[in-house]
Amino acid sequence: MEKAKKIIIPVVIALLLIGIGAGGYFFYESANYYKTDNASVSAHMVNIVPMVSGTVSSWGIEEGDKVNQGQILGNLDVFSMVSSSKVDQTALENSANSILAKAEIKAPINGEIVQTNVIKGVTVALGSTMAVVADTSDMFIKANIEETNIFKIKPEQKVSIKIDAYPGKTFAGYVESVAPATQNAFSQFSSLNTSGTYSKVTQMIPVRISIINDESLPMLIGMNATIKISIK
């Protein structure tokens, strides 16, 4: 019996110490850091939209192409659509130069084409998205923070970043900005419920985090990330 006590007591003490240590570590981490895996690599993206409706007569870009602001990416044939319609032909001829200028599809920013939705011969409508260009020279992390924790997050706080594509690698960064509205604030569907029942959902606020990529490791928009923000 005495021998059993000599074995059990040290084991119990060891387990207690482990529990205390784990609890202390958890308390320290929660008091000093905010961590989430609701984050991903992102970049400033702009939709490329036509200023007039027409048929795509030329389209010379593909996903992955680098483009410069103002570069002509394609052209629309707009006259074939209006010549047969009830349009004053004299007015059409007088405004030909203006229409031709609008028929040129130009890159709105410097960047990389990350999506293209059209091919030569298709008809596109005014304001429709023909392609998306991203400024991949300034990649950042977009994290979604719960409204219950958002007031812990402030610009300039240091951040440790892990990208799933690079296991074992930790990137440094800092909080650049906190969005002034929740993700759903500008949803086309109202969050108001008129049926008499309502389920409250925790809202998420987008936070932009810079990432220091000294090794210039390749990163793709949408790659999963885990971030740890120093809140003290």
Model-derived features: positions:
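Hydrophobic alpha-helix/coiled-coil detector that fires on Leu/Ile/Phe-packed helical surfaces
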Residues: A22-Y34, P50, S137-D138, N144-F151, ...
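Short beta-strand-turn/beta-hairpin segments enriched in glycine/proline and small hydrophobics
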Residues: Y33-M51, A91-P108, V133, I141, ...
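Short hydrophobic beta/alpha edge segments that flank linear recognition/processing sites
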Residues: N68-D88, S95-L100, V124-A143, S160, ...
